[in-house]
Amino acid sequence: MVQIPQNPLILVDGSSYLYRAYHAFPPLTNSAGEPTGAMYGVLNMLRSLIMQYKPTHAAVVFDAKGKTFRDELFEHYKSHRPPMPDDLRAQIEPLHAMVKAMGLPLLAVSGVEADDVIGTLAREAEKAGRPVLISTGDKDMAQLVTPNITLINTMTNTILGPEEVVNKYGVPPELIIDFLALMGDSSDNIPGVPGVGEKTAQALLQGLGGLDTLYAEPEKIAGLSFRGAKTMAAKLEQNKEVAYLSYQLATIKTDVELELTCEQLEVQQPAAEELLGLFKKYEFKRWTADVEAGKWLQAKGAKPAAKPQETSVADEAPEVTATVISYDNYVTILDEETLKAWIAKLEKAPVFAFDTETDSLDNISANLVGLSFAIEPGVAAYIPVAHDYLDAPDQISRERALELLKPLLEDEKALKVGQNLKYDRGILANYGIELRGIAFDTMLESYILNSVAGRHDMDSLAERWLKHKTITFEEIAGKGKNQLTFNQIALEEAGRYAAEDADVTLQLHLKMWPDLQKHKGPLNVFENIEMPLVPVLSRIERNGVKIDPKVLHNHSEELTLRLAELEKKAHEIAGEEFNLSSTKQLQTILFEKQGIKPLKKTPGGAPSTSEEVLEELALDYPLPKVILEYRGLAKLKSTYTDKLPLMINPKTGRVHTSYHQAVTATGRLSSTDPNLQNIPVRNEEGRRIRQAFIAPEDYVIVSADYSQIELRIMAHLSRDKGLLTAFAEGKDIHRATAAEVFGLPLETVTSEQRRSAKAINFGLIYGMSAFGLARQLNIPRKEAQKYMDLYFERYPGVLEYMERTRAQAKEQGYVETLDGRRLYLPDIKSSNGARRAAAERAAINAPMQGTAADIIKRAMIAVDAWLQAEQPRVRMIMQVHDELVFEVHKDDVDAVAKQIHQLMENCTRLDVPLLVEVGSGENWDQAH
């Protein structure tokens, strides 16, 4: 590690930091509308730097106005850069004034760039025996590094001495100019030699030396071991003029004529009154207070009155980072020494981004192809371990790479950020590595910030938060049947793609995390529910569930016969044969030949045959009823009875569903492959499918299900005395509701009245209208309205809750669960009545459904912790709606069921008791 000597000359690349701060910070303004974000970023960096190193001599160097000698050498130099934004230009003059008021010398020299001024001062100081610390984010400055000249990037806290330059760029400081001349520099529009990238440039320079040597001994190039070595000499010769032009453009001048010497760059005492006026004008309130208290700076060359004080960007502005993604500092690691050096960096990083690359999306069967890491914006590494295409270079073996990385990956204190880390955790588990230190998941950060703002995949988030279009997998792998798997992709493309994944993930975290920290409720959900749930879901997925394919096969054969019967019945009703699965043919039969009046139309103008429409038509016509039954059975057959046996993993003999935390608006989990949530709950067909979910030998299935959880949450949220009393006394809530609504003694309530009350109870949770209730109960609308009016008379707290929630939603634009999860409702003030009504229904339902989701997630976390600590023989194998399903050894059933029951009922406190019903059996149906 580089040791910074005492009292170095500090040279700050002001222009570099000005642009980086502009892109890193949000567009902050003061109350007068004047931009302040870039100023804030630069000043924050300067203050931290001066307070940390306490120099007696320093300078902040900016580019001067006008052209430089490089523009005369090459007319396209930096020509691709857009003009300086007006809101950045407006900050330059006040920033200069603040820098000077801080007591720091400020330099800008016409005809050259800030780099040249810094290079000249650095060499002068070195000759005088003074150590130099250059604060910059530009890679071309690496050419200035010597044992006495060090670079520091204060935005990422990265320090580069000679050894670190080699580790980062693959060449020593004295070859950095040659390195840039060969590969070019897209940020400055330095052309370089066409076809020479980072790896080729490194191979040339490491093999033979600098540009002069390459052109003096071209015959030796063909003997180097890199792709394209045999033709490289000719390519260099063809582009010799461009190479040497690039060399000139990349060379930092160290002989600029300056009016000041290093010894004259003394740090002065801050001009407190001037600083105070500027800070007040631009409303840097925290710093205003610091200046007034005499504790703005503490440097040896000045006399501030107080001890240094730590500051954080988060004190006044979101701690965000650059939105410009550059591939210049991505490396592909092919040797152990470089990997060990990177591991050392990762171990010191406060947090790092991490990603895996594989040959399949199925994390149970997938093989690890490589890993990528990022420790600072723009700096990332890819470690390939299994690329096996023709002529692929030698790589560190998968076993050796994981052996070296395992301590870091399993270190709880090494905080990791990823995008959908549940997948990466599963991949590593295939190789016996338990991923720990899972601190941040950008998919979940986005989801918790706003579940309905858009998609939460990395590509979408990069466009939304970073304004960056990522490299897509299709771009490097192709499409369709000829698509390559990741192990077949050339390292040059694979390395950039994989490193970008880690880099973008880190930058997304740095953008979103400050926003999340501002909101107590969402932050609580993220830290205490969603992130702890990641390893729990990963374990459930890996546990999988045992399926009996014979049960499903028999069921499928029965469904085939029943579908044939329904098809025959439909043909008889229609008076002709037609394809029941054809929407077009069904439209013709129903609305043309049978003369049924269409209820709705599709966006294309055709009469709708949706499930909702058919349900309404089925009240009056026989054919829609048959079609509905046919569709339901056909879906069960294709989705479950036929498909589930094909989903059995040959490696494990079990079915492994995938759970998704960031899909539903309200926080409910969803699942795919298979979708467990869509298995019918209350009919015989659903029971038959559940019978195929079986326990292995000597084990039984245990199911634990929250009873009427959303109604209990409604009672808690509404504080309605009638509901609270009914639940507290353990009454049948639907019978109790019927007694209240119909004014009857509890014991005289009929099953039909209970059914009506149940429809009201559950309907209100989902914001059902009188029209919807009428349709469900098949009664006149007026009668349904009467039932609802009676309900609200008997349970006035519920009506008050609904009205209060609607009002809060309109005022805030969102509603919250008990834990603070938010559901934003963009249509709550819509001029479109249907959209507004849907948003109002969602406003009423979301706090209940979302709170139920939070409760079962808390239960999963609590139960999993107990299982991991005390019950290794018990497996949690499924989560479906409000139910958790386990495999339990037959000798442990009673004790385990009792503890699960207790943990689930006590994971959250409501004003009404939570009730958990636990059952067991040889299969899921028996347990359920």
Curated annotation (Swiss-Prot):
Say which domain of life the source belongs to: Bacteria
Q: Which UniProt keywords apply?
A: DNA damage, DNA repair, DNA replication, DNA-binding, DNA-directed DNA polymerase, Exonuclease, Hydrolase, Nuclease, Nucleotidyltransferase, Transferase
Q: Domain named 3'-5' exonuclease: which ranges?
A: 324-517
Annotated region (Polymerase), positions in chain: 521-928
Q: Name one GO molecular function term.
A: 3'-5' exonuclease activity
Q: What does this protein do?
A: In addition to polymerase activity, this DNA polymerase exhibits 3'-5' and 5'-3' exonuclease activity. It is able to utilize nicked circular duplex DNA as a template and can unwind the parental DNA strand from its template.
Name the PANTHER family for this protein: DNA POLYMERASE I (PTHR10133), DNA POLYMERASE NU (PTHR10133:SF27)
Q: Which family does it belong to?
A: Belongs to the DNA polymerase type-A family.
What's the protein called, per UniProt? DNA polymerase I
According to its UniProt entry, this protein's organism is Escherichia coli (strain K12)
State the encoding gene.
polA
